[in-house]
Amino acid sequence: MTNANVDATPLTTKPSQDGFYMPAEWAAQQAVWMIWPYRPDNWRSAGAYAQATFAKVADAIGAATPVYMGVPKAFLAEAKTVMPSHVTLVEMDSNDCWARDTGPTVVVNDNGECRGVDWGFNAWGGHNGGLYFPWDKDEQVAQQMLKQHGFARYSAPLILEGGSIHVDGEGTCMTSAECLLNANRNPDLTKEQIEDLLRDYLNVKQFIWLQDGVYMDETDGHIDNMCCFARPGEVILHWTDDETDPQYSRSKAAFDVLQNTVDAQGRKLKIHLLPQPGPLYCTEEESKGVTEGTGVPRTAGERLAGSYVNFLITNNRIVFPLLDPATDDIAAQKLQEIFPEYEIVGVPAREILLGGGNIHCITQQIPSGK
């Protein structure tokens, strides 16, 4: 690990030209990044509940992988008292704490060298349905993380959040039209142009387009809350059997796409179904602790986009959200069946869900290379 003062000037080539690609999440990892939550207009009690939850997530990850946490200078002393001692705190400004979406996508080559892709970011929609303003500090997060590791940087001409893509490391990229083709992300680009940019910067060949993500997902249906790869040729889909639930039609449509597609290696997909928790709703008490600001309001009675698919694979561990006593054990058992070689660790994560995401959304892995 270096703390090199890397030139901020981005590379003029593209990862695919240079032999770099985005590895799958199950590839070996040298670190996982998180960011300190503090926005009072998104996190109740100015983030106090969320901070305690983030500490538990960091602890669960830290048993398998070193954890770095970006923290604004004003909160460093507080973070030291809350976070486990093994977490490396890095002074870093941010508008909020979604490391998956503001952090870099680290790409590797066959020699084990790592570089980072720095995507454009507009807070999930900019002035057309975005979740807060401003987002200028978030736009600097990826560059700061890459500097910490001494990785060279590619600057991609595409608004994209890390939670909107999943890859299998063998040429396949899965995403959702609800997000990537949304007019509030890249309105001047066609689907084909977006695919071309993903080929350039992820070095993928085949795309699996699901139409929609999870019902009421304020990110416009991020794929990481809806469906993910378990290993090459296998996916895990957020599911409900209740045909009267608004989620049913979304999951059924996704299932139909997955059942009738092949990956970049020509494989038919094995589909695992992970039951949805709840439905879950924000309570009056939970909404009271959030102040008014530029962030999206947190309203009592609002349905939460809870999903067990929003887990992190990190080295020998799966860290997944505990969201509903009625379904947590079922989710854990299902994950253990899908991942028999992994340790399955659940962390109570409702506080993250109240802020609009979950464990995968607040983490960003740094692959080891080889």
Swiss-Prot record:
It holds the Pfam family PAD_porph. Its EC number is 3.5.3.12. It catalyses: agmatine + H2O = N-carbamoylputrescine + NH4(+). Keywords: Hydrolase. The active site is at residue 361. The keyword Plastid does not apply. InterPro entries: Agmatine_deiminase, Peptidyl-Arg-deiminase_porph. This is Putative agmatine deiminase.
